[in-house]
Amino acid sequence: MSLCLWKQCLDRLQSELPSTEFSMWIRSLKAKLNNNILEIYAPNQFILDWVKDKYLIHFKKILQDFCGSNSPFIKFKVYQTSKEKKFKKNILQKIQNLNAKPIWDKIPIFKKSSHRSNINKKHSFENFIEGKSNQLARAAASQVAKNPGNSYNPLFLYGGTGLGKTHLLHAIGNGILAYKYNVKIIYMHSERFVQDMVKALQNNAIEKFKLYYRSVDALLIDDIQFFAHKERSQEEFFHTFNALLEGNQQIILTSDRYPKEINGVEDRLKSRFGWGLTVAIDPPELETRVAILIKKADENNIVLSDEVAFFIAKHLRSNVRELEGALNRVIVNANFTHRSITVEFVREALRDILALQEKLVTIANIQKTVAEYYKIKVADLLSRRRSRSVARPRQMAMAMAKELTNHSLPEIGDAFSGRDHTTVLHACRKIEQLRKENHDIKEDFSNLIRTLSV
């Protein structure tokens, strides 16, 4: 009975949550029903706390639907594998043995590693601005930093330029170093791996190359898509990847696209990229963009009003790097001219950027891009046809227009053959709902945002 009820809960959640979210937080849970108490077990405290905070309401509602007034009480616990129990038992035994004699002379002196990790200490989880667009990626990265080699291995982060992938890579590296002593971590761009391999081949030192890369505790590689069409590098990385995974050594990779969409990379590598957890980082939503601007201004000892932050965030939508660049320009101009940072001042300081944005993102451009993406005609979007193959892309285009332009709902409706503003509002709400429930719609939305923001 307990297994049947738990399976029903999982099936329901799987149908309601995006596949990435379900795989990341729910799939690893176990459960047992005893005396009308449903004990839900998580593999570690981090996942337990997250699930309890984010999904307890979901579980209660599902149980209410299935069991009515007889719904079981929910308890959360951390489960341990037999391997973990044995490990803890051995540790406790060693501690007991050590307590019987002085141990001060046996404490190891940890020395700073001689290798260069290339980890940038400025990038941490604390100064990474979290929002809906990057929440899962940050949570996964944090978990990997606390438990490298055992949580989500490999971790694959993907998304457009300037969205925070590199920041999270460095944050993971700093996090691991904060939790563990004397670990060997290497951060690098994929081109550095290629260069090192070529140099090793030229110097007849390939065995040293292999030993170096396979002896790390964590390997962090940025922009893995640059391995494309480099067969020898892919071959060597394939074997390095396998060796690290077998040794429970952590691998974290980033790319500007989903693993299966990386052209020029062998299928066996792309398959391995997806063995752990693959998480997208989307362009930041308006609230996150505002928070990023205010945080960055504060770091520069600048007080940025909500009105100004909102104005900049509303007009610059593509990525964090673009936001920071615009803010830096505003700050430099303000310092140089000794003027206050107002909306009018920002409009003047960023006039060329704002003009370019207005020129690039138009409703007509959105309609053309969406039509091409869904392989239909722009005329179909503007028609009165209501078949799903046309209606869903039309709703997506309307939602894009609201997200990426400053046009009002009536203006957007006019651009779609004079539709009423309530139709546009319904389309926007529908797409927002589907993005939460349907992984394909969420991916479509992210892909279109990236395309239109380039």
From Swiss-Prot:
GO cellular component: a single term: cytoplasm
Cleaved signal peptide residues: none
Residues reported to bind ATP: G162, G164, K165, T166
Gene Ontology biological-process entries: DNA replication initiation; regulation of DNA replication
Main subcellular location of this protein, as a coarse class: cytoplasm
Region (Domain I, interacts with DnaA modulators): 1-79
Function field: Plays an essential role in the initiation and regulation of chromosomal replication. ATP-DnaA binds to the origin of replication (oriC) to initiate formation of the DNA replication initiation complex once per cell cycle. Binds the DnaA box (a 9 base pair repeat at the origin) and separates the double-stranded (ds)DNA. Forms a right-handed helical filament on oriC DNA; dsDNA binds to the exterior of the filament while single-stranded (ss)DNA is stabiized in the filament's interior.
HAMAP family per UniProt: DnaA_bact (MF_00377)
UniProt-recorded name of the protein: Chromosomal replication initiator protein DnaA
Gene giving rise to this polypeptide: dnaA
